[in-house]
């Protein structure tokens, strides 16, 4: 494995980047923690963060390396598949409120559609969102097949859709989140790959079209390294690897990975591309973080508003029982619930 040692310290890295004006302007706009990631890459301390969209799509580019993505997906699904097409994900119905850091949609040789997503935190991508995402993919395929076959269309022409979600971290700050509780329940706490599909408790044998594969990279880091020689272990190790020391050990175990890490090392000679990819990753992360925080805030506001509405309803009932007039009830609500006169009157009229 190639490990370059072109730079001795941060100052020499920044002097090098400064010779590329576009890269330097982007680099200087980064937060300190992201500057450190860039510095560590050029100092050969860290590899590129492959869980982030621009880096993943560069290393798993289907045009230049058609086998890599096929092998990764095959190892997850447990069956050999071939990626034949990268599909646009711009029209996906699922936007915002999740900490998405990588997203790719592909068509397999048998016509199936597979999405591979990497989420920063499991709490931001609950089962309801996964269900919606899978339904989106199924509807997308249905419309494509129906438009292609027209009057010859039948439902047997629709292939499976596989939703693969890789969680960079399933350990949330709040352990009462349902997704956290699911991943860390006692029977599955040491499992990093979870496969799900629709089954019947009677054993009725019907094959439905939606399947889910959920992977916890943080759990894999704890229990998965060096446990076996399966290809899935190799690919997940690649995604979980951050340092050149770990990368070197990985290449010793899987010599075919030398090519990948040599390609990563070569980017040291292309600082504009490296900084641009970091910039894209940072923007995607920040945009999704802001949206996630806004959605969390709105959910809290909605919850608090519900509590206020319930309190106001109880107060109105009490005033009705005490034979208060509607006008008195409105004035009391204004004082007790900090409402405007019009809002208080609307609540009284609604519940009187």
Regions found by a protein language model. Give the residues of each.
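Short hinge/gating elements
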Residues: 52-60, 217-224, 246-250
